[in-house]
Amino acid sequence: MKFFLKDGETSRALSRSESLLRRVKELGTNSQQSEISECVDEFNELASFNHLLVTVEHREWMEQHPNQSSKLRVPSRIGEMLKEIRAFLKVRVVTPMHKETASDTLNAFLEEYCRITGLAREDALREKMRKVKSVVLFHHSELLKFEVTENMFSYTELLKLNLSLRVISSQILGMAI
């Protein structure tokens, strides 16, 4: 099944992952947005390739070991590096809604949403959380110095937003990265 994935492509992806890991470790708070965006784009390319590679390897492994659990498989080296890269790309950002736990953050978003819209908490709870988050973030967009775009809540846009602001952890937005 691996006929379309050459070993050269895998080793190139591995060396690109190592190179990207070195680059993201060197990123500082004064890094240019363009440099950060390049890292995010390269991370996304490597993540797509790794997903394809893992899918192919998983199928091959299941064909060779049909009676064993797939949990016994060893994770790929690229996948391990991508986890480390992602950890370096995740940054903390402080907003008026930032709290230490996810449930406190959710409550802070709801309180801020109620304050902005004038709705009661019970009514706010009936709203979709995506709408609550977007209203609150839009309301604070000037303060946070980012432009709200229509695809802002896609994974890549959230990651770019987090990197450029240097203020919000993924748990604030309710995403598990």
Swiss-Prot record:
Cell location: Host cytoplasm
UniProt keyword terms in alphabetical order: Host cytoplasm, Host-virus interaction, Inhibition of host innate immune response by virus, RNA-binding, Suppressor of RNA silencing, Viral immunoevasion
Recorded GO MF terms: identical protein binding; RNA binding
GO cellular-component term (any): host cell cytoplasm
Primary location recorded for the protein, binned into one broad class: host cell
Highest taxon listed in the record's lineage: Viruses
Pfam families xref list: RSS_P20, Suppressor_P21
GO biological process, one term: symbiont-mediated suppression of host innate immune response
Chain's role: Acts as a suppressor of RNA-mediated gene silencing, also known as post-transcriptional gene silencing (PTGS), a mechanism of plant viral defense that limits the accumulation of viral RNAs. Binds to ssRNAs and dsRNAs in vitro. Also functions as a replication enhancer.
Subunit-structure text: Homooctamer. The eight monomers assemble into a closed ring that binds RNA.
Record-given protein name: RNA silencing suppressor
Lineage: Viruses, Riboviria, Orthornavirae, Kitrinoviricota, Alsuviricetes
